[in-house]
């Protein structure tokens, strides 16, 4: 099965089973960013079924490129293993199962790209745990940061979304205003932020 076959199967599975994966409108930007930064060591929070990991894998350094990806949900973790093991990139992707807020406290590696795509209300807390492991000049991508148009603009979020929206606003305030980040927000899909980490001493 080719990589395109696997990705197509994942898109169908995600649609049928209501699994959130990158939207078609975001995929081109996502691939462009990975291709631009050419990371060798990637940390992903929110594997889902491994779709974004398989988009990234061919764009990494052929010799040293590696992805570590964390997922809490048992079924999604198993589906990610199923799809990734069918690909040519199984040796480049390490899947960890567990609550990211706990797993992140046990990190020992260093990463030059981080992709936040797990629980939206946890982005800032997770970023604070991850930053000691981000190389200077590393990049943090965060998906869904505009969350249905509620985070920026005049739309009032329904009560059930108020906490998520508030926490995403706090995340964006942090990465846009701290001097050690250079942040750009792209409006494609549900919004993606790209923050370049200038280092701990900047």
Question: Language-model segments: which ranges?
Answer:
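A short alpha-helical cap/connector motif
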Residues: 1-113, 120-141, 145-202
């Amino acid at each position: 099965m080719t990589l395109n076959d696997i990705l197509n199967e994942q898109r169908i599975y995600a649609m049928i089973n209501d699994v959130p994966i990158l939207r078609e409108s975001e995929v081109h930007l996502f691939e462009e960013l990975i291709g631009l930064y050419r990371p060798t060591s990637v940390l992903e929070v929110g594997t889902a079924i491994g779709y974004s990991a398989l988009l990234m894998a061919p764009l990494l350094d052929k010799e040293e490129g590696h992805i570590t990806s964390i997922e809490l949900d048992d079924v999604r973790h198993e589906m990610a293993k199923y799809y990734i093991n069918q690909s040519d990139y199984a040796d480049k992707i390490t899947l960890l199962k567990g609550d990211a807020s706990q797993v992140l406290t046990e990190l020992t590696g260093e990463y030059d790209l981080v992709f936040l795509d797990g629980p939206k209300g946890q982005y800032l807390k997770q970023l604070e745990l991850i930053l000691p492991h981000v190389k200077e000049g590393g990049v943090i991508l965060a998906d869904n940061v505009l969350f249905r148009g509620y985070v920026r603009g005049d739309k009032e979020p329904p009560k059930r979304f108020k906490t998520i929206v508030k926490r995403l606003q706090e995340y964006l305030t942090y990465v846009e205003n701290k001097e050690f980040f250079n942040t750009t927000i792209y409006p494609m899909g549900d919004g993606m932020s790209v923050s370049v980490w200038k280092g701990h001493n900047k």
